[in-house]
Amino acid sequence: MEAFSGTPVVVAVAAVAATVLLLLLLRGAGRRPGRPVTLRDPQAKYPLPLVGKEEISHDTKKFRFGLPSPDHVLGLPVGQHVYLSAKINGNLVIRAYTPVSSDETKGYVDLIIKVYYKNVNPKFPEGGKMSQYLDSMKIGDVIDFRGPNGLLVYKGSGTFMIKPDKKSEAQRKFAKHLGVIAGGTGITPMLQLIRHITSDPKDSTKCYLLFANQTEKDILLRAELEDIAKRHPDQVRLWYTLDRPPQDWKYSSGFVTADMIKTHLPPPGGETLILMCGPPPMIQFACQPNLDKLGYPKSSTFSY
């Protein structure tokens, strides 16, 4: 009997060790090996330096911000956005933006932002506070990022988790058919989503994009959108509408209408989801009323 007296102790120690190892493995399962995440706390501010600025169109620029190291990723789930904040003329200004760079991108994050200059739009003579501030930043200047934020997260393979409001629990929504209406810079969260879907061979979600702009030169990221549609013709459909189209324009013209939605987006159904992002008047007076008219239930629509 003496020879076997230590067996229970050995077994107990082994069990504890196995449990600790399992807990460590589970704790690390959600982390990306070798990829430190920048946005670790959604309530914290992360000062990031401007490392590049590129003109995209007459009033739109791409701003590149450096992450803490060349190995860092931003850490932004698909469907979420970041907040940028800065003291401008003594006041704290906060704006939400969706990066156009992938969350697989290491070392930097790209934002495409339309700059609203002073004395251009008579309704807004002061222009955009944050966009003009960003435009005035010099390489090396720092601005605070905070996130992830947002009510929608795309989990992949057609599965969305959507919160009705900030205090509610997220509800699962499955969509085989994803209709997307974007206006102007509202294309950025849509590109993030479409890019993610088409980059996953296991994701068969079909995407239908209706993209509204004022003029042809205002169409942001057109080359990339058309390249994605060309490479995935069975999965991505792309259509435009312009307020002021050129003479040889082959797409639609004017505000988003019920006929455009009916023709170019998936019909109402249990596996259809419609996402919208753009100027509030477009959502309130063009998109939502026409979706209601066509019988899309509120549970199948979401506005960023």
UniProtKB/Swiss-Prot annotation:
Binding site for FAD: 135-165, 174-209
UniProt cofactor(s): FAD
Chain ranges passing through the membrane: 6-26
Pfam families: FAD_binding_6, NAD_binding_1
Compartmental location: Membrane
One GO cellular component term noted in the UniProt record for this chain: mitochondrion
Protein's recorded name: NADH-cytochrome b5 reductase 2
Cysteine-cysteine disulfides: none
PROSITE patterns for this protein: FAD_FR
Catalysed conversion reaction: 2 Fe(III)-[cytochrome b5] + NADH = 2 Fe(II)-[cytochrome b5] + NAD(+) + H(+)
Residue stretches making up the FAD-binding FR-type domain: 43-155
A GO molecular-function descriptor: cytochrome-b5 reductase activity, acting on NAD(P)H
GO biological process, one term: sterol biosynthetic process
Gene (UniProt): CYB5R2
Organism: Gallus gallus
InterPro entries assigned: CBR-like, Cbr1-like_FAD-bd_dom, FAD-bd_FR_type, Flavoprot_Pyr_Nucl_cyt_Rdtase, FNR_nucleotide-bd, OxRdtase_FAD/NAD-bd, Riboflavin_synthase-like_b-brl
